[in-house]
Amino acid sequence: MIKVLSPAKINLGLWVLGRLPSGYHEILTLYQEIPFYDEIYIREGVLRVETNIGIPQEENLVYKGLREFERITGIEINYSIFIQKNIPPGAGLGGGSSNLAVVLKKVNELLGSPLSEEELRELVGSISADAPFFLLGKSAIGRGKGEVLEPVETEISGKITLVIPQVSSSTGRVYSSLREEHFVTPEYAEEKIQRIISGEVEEIENVLGDIARELYPEINEVYRFVEYLGFKPFVSGSGSTVYFFGGASEELKKAAKMRGWKVVELEL
């Protein structure tokens, strides 16, 4: 049996530039891998993908990716996958996309790399726009739907705390609430990202997070509580995770326990 770790990400800012000809929205974002992981176990056996939280196999991005891998390569996959989910679904942390990228990269290696890095990137990107980032990791600017990546080194370090309410945010619902007034120019977003890369985290903005706070009162409650504690809150992706730079106080931990929020303290 092989064990691999599947990291989460946060978005250190996300801007929507408009619509692509495909109908998808064009975004600009700064991805940051964080040391918060799902644990994935791979063993030889009948192709099966299971999780500890009961995600139906046919809905799991990993299963979809493995079936597509079989179709493209003509190779039958004889591996059973078990995913210990620590990263909540619908949290804006890219857990499912990370699982997809990590498993397909490992299975490709185990089978002698029938797919090139570019082919693997195209495969996972066809299933999830966030997935190609997890083949790269660390920090990267995401353009297009998020799949056109530019690796960068940021000046951001130190403690970061995630606060995750008990609500799963629907990315589709958030995107469908976008209006033209939410769009910004590429020049505006590029300038913001360069400032954030240099360590000016107060420049972080996320229009999807603003919409998620309107759609899901639970996210806004966390956001307002973090503000009350004196920190500047940020939303990752389309929610539901709210994060801030700093450690978790006893007051936050107590409030989180009462409200069922998950608190994760990390070091960047």
UniProtKB/Swiss-Prot annotation:
Active site per the UniProt annotation: K9, D130
Enzymatic class: transferase
InterPro entries, sorted: GHMP_kinase_C_sf, GHMP_kinase_N_dom, IspE, Ribosomal_Su5_D2-typ_SF, Ribsml_uS5_D2-typ_fold_subgr
Biochemical pathway: Isoprenoid biosynthesis; isopentenyl diphosphate biosynthesis via DXP pathway; isopentenyl diphosphate from 1-deoxy-D-xylulose 5-phosphate: step 3/6
Top-level lineage group: Bacteria
UniProt EC number: 2.7.1.148
A Pfam family of this chain: GHMP_kinases_N
Annotated keywords: ATP-binding, Isoprene biosynthesis, Kinase, Nucleotide-binding, Transferase
Gene Ontology terms describing biological process: isopentenyl diphosphate biosynthetic process, methylerythritol 4-phosphate pathway; terpenoid biosynthetic process
One MF term in the entry's GO annotations: 4-(cytidine 5'-diphospho)-2-C-methyl-D-erythritol kinase activity
Catalytic activity: 4-CDP-2-C-methyl-D-erythritol + ATP = 4-CDP-2-C-methyl-D-erythritol 2-phosphate + ADP + H(+)
Binding site for ATP: P88, P89, G90, A91, G92, L93, G94, G95, G96, S97, S98
Gene3D superfamilies per the UniProt record, alphabetical: 3.30.230.10, GHMP kinase, C-terminal domain
Function of the protein: Catalyzes the phosphorylation of the position 2 hydroxy group of 4-diphosphocytidyl-2C-methyl-D-erythritol.
Family listed: Belongs to the GHMP kinase family. IspE subfamily.
Name this protein carries in UniProt: 4-diphosphocytidyl-2-C-methyl-D-erythritol kinase
